[in-house]
Each structure stands twice: as structure tokens, then as C-alpha cells.
Amino acid sequence: MLEGVIRESITKANAKALKKDGYLIANIYGKGVENVNCAFKLNPFIKYLKEKKHLIFPVKLGDKTFEVVVQEYQKNPVTNELIHVDLLAVTKGVKSKFKVPVKHQGTPVGLKNKGILMLSKKRISVECAPEHLPDHYLVDVAPLDVNESILVRDLEKHENVKILDHDSIAVIGVIKAK
């Protein structure tokens, strides 16, 4: 479980001091949850996120435990280092909006015909309760030839999950190489 510290002071000087000590500034918020300003050690946070198997993961702050999902993050444009992260605290049975990653499997037929695989949409916006949240959308790209694509409407439908993106948006496709 990922452990962090609650920030007592939310001043700019306090944030700079925490960043200097190797902390990542974070906010936890959600429906029915009071906003919490906190900080996590940067390297363990990144390592934990890369190894987690589900979108929802637990974090511990002092004696409180929250089930959260990464809602938004900010990176330094020059160094590409994480600066800040917003975590959405989820409550069982309460619908929220999430962004679910798209993963693909297989090798498209179109690659042999001088095509390039193009991932147009890396995340799909959905609305559901946390217990119905899919970990990812898996797309089989093997049958795709040049100038063919998979649209949002072609994705696997999950029960109790509403896809918020428009049906005609391309998720992944094979385009002709120039």
C-alpha cells in the first residue's frame, strides 16, 4: 500500500520544501470526501503506479485509508518530471467519471502492406460506479488493413459502464506510410 503524509500547511514555501526533500504534491478529493492536501515520496509513487494491476488503488495517510484513482497529473515541460497529481477518492456505489486506458494486441495485416499502426485515443472516458470500472479496453488489431480503424462503437461493451466519448471517434487504426 502506498503511504503518504498529510500537508499541514499549503503554502508555496512548504510545497517547495517538500519537493526539495523528494516529495510529490497531491490532492485527494471526491464525492462525500473532504479534500485532503498530501504528499508522497516521488520514486516509490512512480514505481507503485507502474506495478499496479488495477486503476483503483489504496493509499494510506496517517490513520486514514482511501481508495483512489489518478484523475490528473502535471509534468515539468522541460525535465518531464512529475510536479503534481490529483487523486479521486472513489466510494462504492457512487458513479464517477474515469479515463480507462486502451491496450492493443496482435500485429495488423496492414503493416505488411506498408501501413503504420496509429493509436488515436489512448484513454476512453467512461461513467460508472467503481466496482464496475474496467481496468482497460483490449483491442485486437490483427484484422486491420491499411485505411481501416476501430471506432469507439466497436469497443467491447461492459455492463453498467457508460462510454462518454462519441461513437464515431477512431481509437486505433492503420494508415498508409508516406
From Swiss-Prot:
Pfam families found in the cross-reference section: Ribosomal_L25p (PF01386), Ribosomal_TL5_C (PF14693)
GO biological process: translation
Taxonomic lineage of the native organism: Bacteria, Pseudomonadati, Campylobacterota, Epsilonproteobacteria, Campylobacterales
PANTHER family: RIBOSOMAL PROTEIN L25/GLN-TRNA SYNTHETASE, ANTI-CODON-BINDING DOMAIN-CONTAINING PROTEIN, RIBOSOMAL PROTEIN L25_GLN-TRNA SYNTHETASE, ANTI-CODON-BINDING DOMAIN-CONTAINING PROTEIN
SUPFAM superfamilies the UniProt entry points to: Ribosomal protein L25-like
MF-aspect GO terms: 5S rRNA binding; structural constituent of ribosome
Annotated family: Belongs to the bacterial ribosomal protein bL25 family. CTC subfamily.
Keywords (A to Z) from UniProt: Ribonucleoprotein, Ribosomal protein, RNA-binding, rRNA-binding
Role description: This is one of the proteins that binds to the 5S RNA in the ribosome where it forms part of the central protuberance.
GO cellular component, one term: cytosolic large ribosomal subunit
Organism of provenance: Helicobacter pylori (strain J99 / ATCC 700824)
Assembly mode: Part of the 50S ribosomal subunit; part of the 5S rRNA/L5/L18/L25 subcomplex. Contacts the 5S rRNA. Binds to the 5S rRNA independently of L5 and L18.
CDD domains per the UniProt record, alphabetical: Ribosomal_L25_TL5_CTC (cd00495)
Name of the protein in its database record: Large ribosomal subunit protein bL25
